[in-house]
């Protein structure tokens, strides 16, 4: 049975992509289609209890940074693709830094090989490799 565990309380927002780097910790990208150019704050939702509850965390104040893809290497280190490129966190979403993920990064896939080496792909207008 499916049950609703999160929904933004702001108009023009929808959840888009999800990444669970562990059993308990997960992140969801939140797209904002708000036509008001003064609404700039973009957010991500995070769970630390396996998806039972979600807390919003700030990503960036940029109305043009519409979010698409999201992918995490581990509970702390992850990426969010946006319309104009992307952002990286190394502290579980407390801080975000701009990073080149190409334009309109819609999907981010992170993989680990048998030896634990991490590699990934960010896909949008371009295909970017990590």
Please place each PLM-identified region on the residue numbering.
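Repeated scaffold domains used in trafficking and secretory/extracellular systems
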Residues: 13-19, 65-69, 104-111
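Short glycine/acidic-enriched loop and turn motifs that connect beta-strands
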Residues: 33-37, 127-128
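Blade-level signature of beta-propeller repeat domains, shared across WD40, Kelch, NHL, RCC1
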Residues: 109-130
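Repetitive beta-architecture junctions, highlighting loop-to-beta-strand starts
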Residues: 40-42, 84, 118
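Entry beta-strands of beta-propeller and related beta-repeat scaffolds
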Residues: 24-28, 76-79, 116-121
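Loop/turn-rich, solvent-exposed surfaces of beta-rich toroidal or solenoidal domains
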Residues: 61-85
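Recurrent small/Gly-Pro-centered beta-turn motifs in extracellular repeat architectures
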Residues: 29-32, 82, 124
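Asp-box/BNR beta-propeller loop motif
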Residues: 1-10, 42-58, 86-103, 126-130
